[in-house]
Curated annotation (Swiss-Prot):
Mode of membrane association: Peripheral membrane protein
Gene: murG
Entry's localization field: Cell inner membrane
Family per similarity comment: Belongs to the glycosyltransferase 28 family. MurG subfamily.
InterPro entries in UniProt: GlcNAc_MurG (IPR006009), Glyco_trans_28_C (IPR007235), GlycoTrans_28_N (IPR004276)
Enzyme class: transferase
Catalysed reaction, written as an equation: di-trans,octa-cis-undecaprenyl diphospho-N-acetyl-alpha-D-muramoyl-L-alanyl-D-glutamyl-meso-2,6-diaminopimeloyl-D-alanyl-D-alanine + UDP-N-acetyl-alpha-D-glucosamine = di-trans,octa-cis-undecaprenyl diphospho-[N-acetyl-alpha-D-glucosaminyl-(1->4)]-N-acetyl-alpha-D-muramoyl-L-alanyl-D-glutamyl-meso-2,6-diaminopimeloyl-D-alanyl-D-alanine + UDP + H(+)
Official protein name in the record: UDP-N-acetylglucosamine--N-acetylmuramyl-(pentapeptide) pyrophosphoryl-undecaprenol N-acetylglucosamine transferase
GO molecular function: UDP-N-acetyl-D-glucosamine:N-acetylmuramoyl-L-alanyl-D-glutamyl-meso-2,6-diaminopimelyl-D-alanyl-D-alanine-diphosphoundecaprenol 4-beta-N-acetylglucosaminlytransferase activity; undecaprenyldiphospho-muramoylpentapeptide beta-N-acetylglucosaminyltransferase activity
Listed EC numbers: 2.4.1.227
Gene Ontology BP annotations: carbohydrate metabolic process; cell division; cell wall organization; lipid glycosylation; peptidoglycan biosynthetic process; regulation of cell shape
Amino acid sequence: MAADGKNVLIMAGGTGGHVFPALACAREFQARGYTVHWLGTPRGIENELVPQAGLSLHLIQVSGLRGKGKLSLLKAPFTLVKAVLQARRIIGQLKPVCVIGFGGYVTGPGGVAARLCGVPLVIHEQNARAGTANRLLVPLSARVCEAFPGTFEAGEKLRTTGNPVRPELFMDAQRAPLGERRARLLVMGGSLGAEPLNKLLPKALSEVPADLRPEVFHQAGKHHAPITAERYQEAGVEAQVEPFIKDMAHAYGWADLVVCRAGALTVSELAAAGLPSMLVPLPHAIDDHQTHNAQYLAREGAAFLMPQATTGAAQLAERLNEVLMQPEKLNTMARTARRLAKPSATSTVVDICLEVAHG
């Protein structure tokens, strides 16, 4: 454990969308000489990623309430009180200079515990529509960080920081001009793959004239890659189909255009990489937050927002034809995306934490 005044506690869990920005900030804290501790739950992705990063992981027992049965709802107050007490004990032992929450079920009880312990609390919201825990923690927080403007009501506590993303994504890709080669299309469905995109893209690309058709790299997910490759073959479209993308910086650097979902981190990475996109938000995301994320890029002309319910192969093919016939349009979208990026997000979030920690 670090000497007094050098511990920081990060709260983040559940999904990569919460954990990866938190890890970026953890590395920045460490670079400034702080020891980072992590508060999570036993079921989230943090159980794998945080120890891999060499950080101390502390666990509390808490889960979400949406969609639970009556018995779980009746138990909820007792479960939450227990989780707050667990978090308060951990905070009391660590004595961090500040606590920062990035979302996930752990953030609610952890944030309350921070307030009870008198430790400054900072929250960071990755999505354009704030999650329940972060909305409830605003009154308890010393600072509120939002990735996208307008997520929270304006106030003295609020800072628009952007999402912390990997610094290598901001490097300019060395590509030949579009007019001198075929365009390159990157299709991403997340680690599990997005089956609607896996079905849609082969059909849509078959309707793009062969002389205009781009090179295709399609990340289809572990269980969907073989059948997706078959669909491309049946459609007469050449494509490289893979279950995962191991090097996202390389994939972004290769691409001229991306078709994907609109998770908060993905949207921020597209801006960082300066990539135009066609965003198909996950239709059943909580509070429809992916649509709100997509609007951040679409409103400024850096992306096309294409709702899944109204986007078929014909509509997607029409949009692809439109931009592939106008390389300068893609270039303009790319410049707009890069303008919307927040390259200093990680250092800004850490600056805010240390500002409230040390006055």
